[in-house]
């Protein structure tokens, strides 16, 4: 008795095209309609693995790790230099979900760069910033600004050690006037010293010492006086 066989279902034409168009593994240049192109690894039709993306509009180049279509892992971002026309590195470090996250180095100019921690493409955590004028800040960051404990070392050697908030000196801190041989210790509000004490500090080694030394002041409880002055200042601020 003859046995009938069911004919195999043929794959529809559009499904075949779609299957063949799915990008997996290493591919050469794949162009987007806007002129951007990518060279590297794919998975399930998205960038995944090692690859290089070039953006036509601004000439930016990213080389590094990708995960499910986004920059994720370690990578380097470069931009064309407006003066030379050549690409220069602007960021090298870690990424997560298409944003700078983890440890990385950002170059703002030939003599200005940041090295430290990032979160959501903003400086956040511990980091060190080298400014073009020669100043150096080292300490905590939040929302792309110094925030927390940190030290600012000026080009002339003077330095501030203490609390920061919103990118400004706020709270208790010490300012070493090493050029004049003096030390100020007190309380700051938005970069302004509001109350504190000034003493001689390394005056004999200072390149430009003050004409006269600060006389020794005999106070029974200098810390208590400073604490009282600070409390009065805070009370005044709250009243405003």
Swiss-Prot record:
InterPro entries assigned: MORN, MORN3
Family annotation (SUPFAM superfamilies): Histone H3 K4-specific methyltransferase SET7/9 N-terminal domain
Gene Ontology CC, one term: acrosomal vesicle
Spans annotated as Interaction with TP53: 206-240
Keyword Hydrolase annotated: no
Coiled-coil stretches noted in the UniProt entry, renumbered to this chain: none
Record keywords: Cytoplasmic vesicle, Repeat
Annotated region described as Interaction with SIRT1, given as residue ranges: 76-100
The MORN repeat ranges on this chain: 38-60, 62-84, 91-113, 114-136, 137-159, 160-182, 184-205
Region spans: Interaction with MDM2: 6-35
Repeat among keywords: yes
Cysteines engaged in disulfide bonds, as pairs: none
Range of residues in the leader sequence: none
Compartmental location: Cytoplasmic vesicle, Secretory vesicle, Acrosome
Function (record text): Assembles a suppression complex (suppresome) by tethering SIRT1 and MDM2 to regulate composite modifications of p53/TP53. Confers both deacetylation-mediated functional inactivation, by SIRT1, and ubiquitination-dependent degradation, by MDM2, of p53/TP53, promoting a proliferative and cell survival behaviors. May play a role in the regulation of spermatogenesis.
Quaternary state and interactors: Interacts with MEIG1. Interacts with TP53, MDM2 and SIRT1; the interactions mediate post-transcriptional modifications of TP53 by MDM2 and SIRT1.
Name by which UniProt lists this protein: MORN repeat-containing protein 3
Organism: Macaca fascicularis (Crab-eating macaque)
Taxonomy of the source species: Eukaryota, Metazoa, Chordata, Craniata, Vertebrata
Encoding gene, per UniProt annotation: MORN3
